[in-house]
Amino acid sequence: MEKSKFEQREYQDFVINFVKNQFSRQRNVIIELDCGLGKRIIMMRLLTDLLSDKKVLAVLHSSSSLAETVKFFNENTNLDFGWLNSRTNKYFRKKLIESKNVIFTTPQIARNLISQGVSFSDFDVLIINEVDKILKRVSTARSILVQPWNSILEAFKTKRIVGMSGTLRDAHAIQTENNVYMASELLTLKSLINAEIITMDEIMKQSDVEKYINKTKIVIVPVYDKNIVSLIQELDQKISAIFHEMKERGIIKDLGKSHKDIVLPHIGDIQYDMFLRLTLLRKYLIAMTPKKARKMWMMSKNSLQIAELSKIPIVDKAPKIDMLFEIIKEKKSSKVIVLCSYKDMVNEIYLRAKKQGFEAFKLTGEVFDKKEMISNFEKIGENAILIISPVGERDLDFSTVNDMFIVDVINTTKTMYQRIKRIRGGHVYILYYKRTSEERKVKRLLRRIKEKYPWSVEIISY
């Protein structure tokens, strides 16, 4: 059945044998396999070998991931499978489900089929890609699962389940009537689907996986601008003061040293509203160009009464952009990826890159054909820059790029680790304004990443 020419690796055999052993004991399985180690190849080997005589539903979390998986299986196997997306005719969906042993689809389509009365009773196995995404980041004890996973898991409650992910080491918050506590995603998933877990630690101890891990060097890059730093520091002080007042009132729940405190929603509370406004304006200043940030500040100046708005220069470039191109020039980087939170910054870096003679590409949610743009970027041998917004970066991997820049970070360890691993190995430069809360945020985040994924990253200073 298999036409693949992929090298068979010891660690893959180890994982497949683990699944085989657990299935023989009627147990479900969760596989932790780091980014870049071939979860799709593991899925291929499961479907073409271990589960070749079984009826399997494989669920991918996005339409782009579904399309890439279908392409991969078409190009590398002779597997007779079907796939369902939002454009698949409902009568054809039923026919495929009845006639094919392997079906690829998304959670939404699976849920729609179940709600329409389609039965999966003759299926044997459910494979969940990125299994961590079935959990809510903040939930009540009665509502832990992201919709539509309640109905999907219910439909497969007597079947075997295989969940796979490279990021299973975060915690999720569970809110009770009087408290909030943190729970391990891995342990919650284990309990939910009655699964045995194979972790990266076990795979590293008992297989050859280490020789296939490309360690990423994370370079932390301080940026300094007197005006911007002084404004961020002023905001830091105001936010800190409000934060401590809200903590005394019980709006903020202290989750201990190992977790970030949670701010519970208090709609209509003046202090809570001001806290949100200030943190958002700080984010603008950190992640936007000064010109755009100043516009956003001006919209809120009456309510905030901050007198130093004039300190934000009205210019067409930002200190972080200056530093970015300085490093590119110094390192003589030939192909570069830049990740930004806002389209304003994407556009500014794109224009600067064009002026400096780079082949520049920008990938946002507005781009209709991501595949074509990425293909054009990859075809260029050197002197190319691809600037990406958070919407544009979903489900992307760039194994041939050695240098990536992250203009600003978010607090979620899992999401930042996934961004860092968009490239395999190489250097990831994270820019931050020094002597501000952003510096503390970046260093705290990288400590957590290093603790959770020590085999995968090395952190160095610029």
Positions of predicted regions on the chain:
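Conserved helicase ATPase motor motifs in RecA-like P-loop NTPase domains
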Residues: 34-37, 132-133, 155-180
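SF2 helicase catalytic motif II
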Residues: 107-110, 117-162
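Conserved SF2 helicase motif VI
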Residues: 411-428
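Conserved helicase ATPase core of P-loop NTP-dependent helicases/translocases
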Residues: 88-97, 335-339, 344-351, 358-390
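Helicase motor interdomain insertion/brace
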Residues: 152, 189-218, 227-344, 348
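Conserved Walker A/P-loop ATP-binding site and its immediately adjacent core
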Residues: 35, 40-45, 53-75, 170-171, ...
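Conserved pre-motif I regulatory segment
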Residues: 1-30
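A short beta-strand element within the Helicase C-terminal
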Residues: 122-127, 387, 394-409, 427-431
